[in-house]
């Protein structure tokens, strides 16, 4: 397994006690495989498992992507949001 690379973002609203923390962990693999696991915390109550796992593989200049949603079919979202955009979207949906 390669070096650990991680990122974290935090969001809260003035008129709410809800606080959301999103973090992603990257484990670069041999031959440029990249595995990404995303975790979400609401009000600092950690989830027991990753919410999704995305794998990217570069072979001969071709990118292959695979995303496993570990929360079920109803919660599938495209994995094209930045951490900040993801936090804003989750905040919007939770605080509606």
From Swiss-Prot:
Biased composition (Polar residues): 77-89
Family statement drawn from the similarity comment of this UniProt entry: Belongs to the geminiviridae protein AC4/C4 family.
Keyword match DNA-binding: no
Entry superkingdom: Viruses
UniProt keyword Iron, yes or no: no
Protein name in the entry: Protein C4
Organism (species): Tomato yellow leaf curl Sardinia virus (isolate Spain-1)
Pfam families: Gemini_C4
Function of the molecule: Pathogenicity determinant. May act as a suppressor of RNA-mediated gene silencing, also known as post-transcriptional gene silencing (PTGS), a mechanism of plant viral defense that limits the accumulation of viral RNAs.
Residue ranges of the TM segments: none
Lipidation, N-myristoyl glycine type: 2
Topology of the protein relative to the lipid bilayer: Lipid-anchor
GO cellular component: host cell plasma membrane; membrane
Xref: InterPro entries: Gemini_C4 (IPR002488)
Keywords attached to this entry: Host cell membrane, Host membrane, Host-virus interaction, Inhibition of host innate immune response by virus, Lipoprotein, Membrane, Myristate, Suppressor of RNA silencing, Viral immunoevasion
Region annotation Disordered: where it falls in the sequence: 66-96
GO biological process: symbiont-mediated suppression of host innate immune response
Compartment(s) where it occurs, according to its Swiss-Prot or TrEMBL record: Host cell membrane
């Amino acid at each position: 397994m390669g070096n650990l690379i991680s990122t974290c973002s935090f969001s809260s609203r003035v008129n709410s006690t809800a606080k959301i923390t999103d973090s992603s962990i990257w484990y670069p693999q041999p031959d440029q495989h990249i595995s990404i696991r995303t975790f979400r915390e609401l009000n600092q109550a950690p989830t027991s498992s990753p919410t999704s796992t995305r794998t990217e593989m570069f072979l001969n200049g071709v990118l292959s992507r695979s995303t496993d949603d570990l929360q079920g079919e109803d919660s599938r979202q495209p994995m094209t949001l930045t951490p900040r955009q993801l936090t804003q979207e989750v905040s919007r949906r939770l605080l509606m």
